[in-house]
């Protein structure tokens, strides 16, 4: 049986609305006049309502003029913040991080010199945005967090690791130093195998290996930033 796309979208919209009411219903009940803003994947092509990307460079204080509006079945109006896209040398996108960047710019205030700033947003897909004044001029994405999880869970590197809630700063720093030193020039694909070799030669304990790998990956991320941004 084929499901008509229009019917599928209607069902998806109802599911989004139900989730929205569960998450925000009590807030809106207490303050019904509160404006509703949403950002992130809710505005993607697979989200509740698509909010088309804005091209960079873009003044972040102009983003509010490009909100996408939708109305729920109960009459609530939701405004969705658009993501950003960089076209040209290699297409790059962000959704949700643009709102965090705007918050950072507001938090900095007039006392901070924003003529040339690099804003880092760590996460599964880390973003680094080059900002001048109130405008996002360019940005990069690094899949550091997701690659770390994949290496730990789906490669031989994870076989000797022991998950722990403790942070082993010395192991992390060791990974950073190796990535940013002469050996780091061999590249991340070569360096990460040292997690395995240190495990086999008692160079790292099972508890330290994850933080060491994290340091390696973050170190190579920073190396790339240094190569492309002053």
Language model: regions and residue ranges:
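Conserved active-site and cofactor/substrate-binding residues in soluble primary-metabolism enzymes
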Residues: 11, 15-19, 95-99, 142, ...
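Glycine-rich beta-strand-to-loop/alpha-helix junction loops that act as flexible
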Residues: 37-42, 122-124, 230
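Short beta-strand-loop/turn "lid" adjacent to the catalytic site in phosphate-handling enzymes
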Residues: 25-91, 133
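Short, intrinsically disordered, charge-balanced linker/junction segments flanking boundaries
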Residues: 2-4, 60, 226-230
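Phosphate/pyrophosphate-binding loops at sites that engage ATP/ADP/AMP, CoA/4′-phosphopantetheine
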Residues: 20-35, 108-112, 222-229
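Short glycine-rich, Thr/Ser-proximal phosphate-binding strand/loop in the N-terminal lobe
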Residues: 1-15
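ATP-binding/phosphotransfer module of carbohydrate and carboxylate kinases, centering on a glycine-rich
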Residues: 156-230
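Glycine-rich phosphate-binding loop plus the immediately following alpha-helix
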Residues: 8-11, 85-118, 122-181
